[in-house]
Swiss-Prot record:
It holds the Pfam family LUC7. This is Putative RNA-binding protein Luc7-like 1. Belongs to the Luc7 family. One of its GO terms (cellular component) is nucleus. Residues 258-317 have a biased composition (Basic residues). Residues 232-371 are annotated as: Disordered. It comes from Mus musculus. The gene is Luc7l. GO terms for molecular function: identical protein binding; mRNA binding; RS domain binding. The modification Phosphoserine is found at residues 336, 363.
Length: 371
């Protein structure tokens, strides 16, 4: 990569996709499924193991330092939970690496000469000391490259102590088996990167292995996987607590709502009961008032009819008595007239005929008119 390309990549990593107003680069967002989430978290095995014996080539997903910068800016404002995707990716990769390690162990067990359990334990001890020496030498070289010479010298002194222990372990291993078998190279599979290690490897070979990019890359991947598992577990626990708290708050609000609703219903029922009671009393009062009014009306109509009947009866009685009195008087007058007619003579008849009425008749009619 040229110096200009390196500067461009550095600017992308620092400022993101919109560092120079390029709209075409913003068409793909870091949230796109085509973007590698492990790359955004700086733990993609394709980047870490690039240039090693186990180079995986280019990743099938998009790798862009500018998108990583965009993600780092956005992750400060809200949680995107990309750790879960990266954890799944690394778990599948480490599972494949562990599978290769088990296959290598099985192949060694089939090809190498069988040894006793005691000899195997002594050989395992030599391997562990070799591994410790290689790690210490790699750490000393790293500290020396960083300029921390004093710490590097202290680690080299520890390396000398471990070398003495290794020499004693090799003597025990040599004395426990025949010379012909001891000269045979005993291999061991590295538990971290599944590479082969020899029992008689020198310190330089061990330092190159444990300080090499392949072994350190696998250590970085495994440590990142452990960190992601811890982060995901913490976030899931926090999410569960938030969900539980929201559920409790919702249940508390529902209980308060039910209590408030119950009190409201009780008040509503009480008011409705009072209204019904007042309405019932008012209806009863109106009914009694109406009943009394109807009773009074009936009583008044009855009395009116009674009075009318009494007046009519009295009027009829008077009419009948008057009529009876008139008929009685008339009959008496007629009887008296008949009697007087029989007693009067021709002169009286002529006078009556000339006047049309007798004096007694005229007096009777006058009396009847006055009545």
């Amino acid at each position: 990569m040229s110096a200009q390309a390196q500067m461009r990549a550095l600017l992308d990593q620092l400022m993101g996709t919109a560092r120079d107003g390029d709209e075409t680069r913003q068409r793909v967002k870091f949230t796109d499924d085509r973007v590698c989430k492990s790359h955004l978290l700086d733990c993609c095995p394709h980047d870490i193991l690039a240039g090693t014996r186990m180079d995986l080539g280019e990743c099938t997903k998009i790798h862009d330092l500018a998108l990583r910068a965009d993600y780092e800016i956005a992750s400060k404002e809200r949680d995107l939970f990309f750790e879960l995707d990266a954890m799944d990716h690394l778990e599948s990769f480490i599972a494949e690496c562990d599978r290769r390690t088990e296959l290598a162990k099985k192949r060694l067990a089939e090809t190498q000469e069988e040894i006793s359990a005691e000899v195997s334990a002594k050989a395992e001890k030599v391997h562990e000391l070799n591994e410790e020496i290689g790690k210490l030498l790699a750490k000393a070289e790293q500290l020396g490259a960083e300029g921390n010479v004093d710490e590097s010298q202290k680690i080299l002194m520890e390396v000398e102590k471990v070398r003495a222990k290794k020499k004693e372990a090799e003597e025990e291993y040599r004395n426990s088996m025949p010379a012909s078998s001891f000269q045979q190279q005993k291999l061991r599979v590295c538990e971290v990167c599944s590479a082969y290690l020899g029992l008689h490897d020198n310190d330089r070979r061990l330092a190159d292995h444990f300080g090499g990019k392949l072994h350190l890359g696998f250590i970085q991947i495994r440590e990142k996987l452990d960190q992601l598992r811890k982060t995901v577990a913490e976030k899931q626990e926090k999410r569960n607590q938030d969900r539980l708290r929201r559920r409790e708050e919702r249940e508390r609000e529902e209980r308060l709502g039910r209590r408030s609703g119950s009190r409201t219903r009780d008040r509503r029922r009480s008011r409705s009961r009072d209204r019904r009671r007042r309405r019932s009393r008012s209806t009863s009062r109106e009914r009694r008032k109406f009943s009394r009014s109807r009773s009074r009306d009936r009583y008044r109509r009855h009395r009116s009819r009674s009075r009318s009947h009494s007046r009519g009866h009295r009027r009829a009685s008077r009419d009948r008595s008057t009529k009876y009195k008139f008929s009685r008087e008339r009959s008496l007058r007629e009887e008296s007239w008949e009697y007087g007619r029989n007693e009067r003579g021709p002169t009286d008849w002529r006078l009556e005929n000339s006047n049309g009425k007798t004096a007694s008749r005229r007096s009777e009619e006058k009396e009847a008119g006055e009545i």
